[in-house]
Amino acid sequence: DDAALEQRIAPHRKAPMLTTLAIAQYRSLHALVVPMARLNLVVGANGSGKSSLYRALRLLAETAQGGVVSALAREGGLQSTLWAGPETLSARMRRGEVPIEGGPRQQPVSLKLGFAGEDFGYAIDLGLPAPSRSLFAHDPEIKREVIWGGPFLRLGNTLVDRRGALVRVRDGRDWRVAGEHLNPFESLFGQIADPRNAPEVLQLRETIRGWRFYDHFRADADAPARLPQLGTRTPVLSHDGHDLAAAWATIREIGDVEALDAAVADAFPGARVEVLVEGGRFSLQFRQHGLLRPLSAAELSDGTLRYLLWIAALHTRSAISLANSLA
């Protein structure tokens, strides 16, 4: 009933923090488990796997958008994204006593990604389909997906379990089949997000969709943030920052205006940022001490534009469970 549904969802309404990230068999990462805190700084030597860690996070985000298989295809397919080392590393290989060499594969091809959060955890296992004459015979498919409650995956706290085309949802002490014909190329988030019968799926999907990746803010002459854009209320800045002016206006209306202005003044004393609306299109105007006219976003230096993008990202009104950026 509605009361039971509310009780089931209520503890998870805030934007939860990730507590653990796990990656196996992805590019230069053989098996990695990373504890997460509120702020995480990843450093390491060249070739240590920093970019692979970041890309794995982006692949996880694609599961909630229905594009994880397409994202893998853009990276060159499953064969190009799998662990590039041998299937197993012997103790002597690890100690450097013998060369690292491969051998005949003993286990099925498998790429595993997952995370645990303050409320739910999620894991996905991608592999190759059974041999066929299909033109898509080399497309990866989803072998298994699991959603659980708590910091660790156990049978007792598993809430949703997908194996191939079949997905089951916890129903008290029993299991209920929620779908028997799931597409192998699409995550369960796009196929059984039922707020009444599978609220965990819907809640986790919206959480992942709230993740933001601010690693490639463009600042060239044709950058989206430099151009006037159609504007609507924008509680969270987009990945590419095209809605910067709308996000800025939203913060000024419903956010912490004093903190926003203080961040501008901290880098540019006496400056202020305004939003100009013409024909439904929003653009930024940058007024600086000593200048007789405001500068448009198209005139700003690369560094100034990126700084304003970061201010908008960090002063967002809506809670974000993951905001990620490359240094």
What is each residue range found by the language model?
Residues 2-16:
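Short, Lys/Arg-enriched N-terminal segments with co-localized hydrophobic residues
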Residues 20-22, 33, 110-114, 121-125, ...:
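Beta-strand secondary-structure signal
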Residues 249, 265, 269-318, 322-327:
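Conserved ABC ATPase signature
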Residues 55-131:
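Conserved P-loop NTP-binding catalytic core
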Residues 31-37, 315-318:
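Phosphate-binding P-loop
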Residues 14-29:
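N-terminal pre-Walker A segment at the start of P-loop NTPase domains
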Residues 110-258, 262:
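Electropositive, glycine-dotted interaction segments
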Residues 38-79, 239, 307-313:
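Phosphate-binding glycine-rich loops of NTP-binding sites
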